[in-house]
Amino acid sequence: MSPNSKELEEKLDPRVKRTRSLILQAFGALLAEKGFEAISVQDVTDKAEINRATFYKHFVDKYALLDYTIKELFKKEIEKRTLDACHYTPENLRSLILAVCEFLSRLHNECAQPHQQFESLVEGTIKKQIFALLSHWLEQSKSRIPIEIPATVATWAIYGLASFYSHSTLARAGGAREKRPVLEKFVEEALPLVAVNLEQFAQRV
């Protein structure tokens, strides 16, 4: 079966949707309970009340499940702000930075003990989506300069800043912790650092 046929079947068959929804719900609950590294496929199938053969019809392993989960959640975050239907403007870039900061913060708050492996997998998935969105924006410009470099630089900058924000609870003397910077203020300070890499490439025709 071709990928397009499989995609069409999944869209039409409510049983496929229901089973995938059960898997995603079970996986989300397990991420909050025990963290990605400790989760096994058996844990997911037990919680979703399906057998392993059914799981493998949807995902090859737990890594593919994590990739799909993060991709879909972040896609909804982008679509909620209609950024996928926009072109480059400083305000749209600001909304994108805000979306990534909020998404990573929520992910770190909701997932138990996010270790390095989990962090790396999430980073790779989200960076691909940021890069695709920035490339889409830049492709609408009149610049003849290849867009790969500015899109890559901006992608790393956005993710790095959002990661810093989501982890920025700094230890103080006596074990107390500082709160994260106020998000709106943080984004306003971060925006020029990212925009400087894009402005010259993003002029509209």
Describe the residue ranges of each PLM region.
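Basic, helix-initiating cap at the start of DNA-binding domains
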Residues: M1-K34, D43, K47
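C-terminal peripheral helix-coil segments that are non-catalytic and often amphipathic
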Residues: M1-K6, H167-V205
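Solvent-exposed, amphipathic alpha-helical segments
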Residues: L22-K34, K76, K80, D84, ...
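DNA major-groove recognition helix of helix-turn-helix
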Residues: I23, F59, L66, I70
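Helix-turn-helix
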Residues: L30-A64
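Short, basic, alpha-helical segments at the C-terminal edge of helix-turn-helix-like DNA-binding modules
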Residues: S40-V41, T69-I78
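Hydrophobic alpha-helical connector segments
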Residues: R81-E110
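Amphipathic alpha-helical packing segments from all-alpha helical-bundle domains
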Residues: S95, Q117-W156, P181, K185
